[in-house]
Amino acid sequence: MKTIEVDEELYRYIASHTQHIGESASDILRRMLKFTAGQPAAVNDTQPVSAPAPSKAAPSAGNESRPQDRVRAVRELMLSDEYAEQKRAVNRFMLILSTLYRLDTAAFAEATTSLQGRTRIYFAGDEHTLLQSGTHTKPKHVPGTPYWVITNTNTGRKRSMVEHIMLSMQFPSELAEKVCGTI
């Protein structure tokens, strides 16, 4: 077993692709790279990729689930102790974003790319991109995802962002309203 050092952003991106508890980094990378044991290593002269931008064609764990299952998962989040223990709106906001991403990565990616302010970008694949649209944006990494989001917006804007994402992901508007009311 060899050890390599990766930056925090890359580590989080790899970790966001964990499919089950206890899965090793090697297993995750093998799956992501479609590399099997015993396969000869191909050496390519490739340019480094700047940011792990989420792809619209990325397979989505939520695509196979029925819409009722997605709705139930969001309702269960709203009733969970973990959600109830969140004292700050920003923490509830981040928990909701993580859950929506986990339910349907492709739909989440599509929804976030269409979500921008007049002068700001709200979501990006790295902190630097968000800081370029404003130095006081307070970017935070959305746990379990390759995304960063600005967090120095008021609660109303956070609600608006969640509502846009949920409606873009085809959640019932009543559920989106209910979720936004808890932020």
UniProtKB/Swiss-Prot annotation:
Keyword Cytoplasm listed: yes
InterPro entries: Arc_rbn_hlx_hlx (IPR013321), Ribbon_hlx_hlx (IPR010985), SeqA (IPR005621), SeqA_DNA-bd_C (IPR026577), SeqA_DNA-bd_C_sf (IPR036835), SeqA_N (IPR033761)
Protein name listed in UniProt: Negative modulator of initiation of replication
Organism the protein comes from: Pantoea ananatis (strain AJ13355)
Region of interest: Disordered: 43-70
Region (Interaction with DNA): 89-90, 118-122, 152-158
GO function terms (MF aspect): sequence-specific DNA binding
Pfam families per the UniProt record, alphabetical: SeqA, SeqA_N
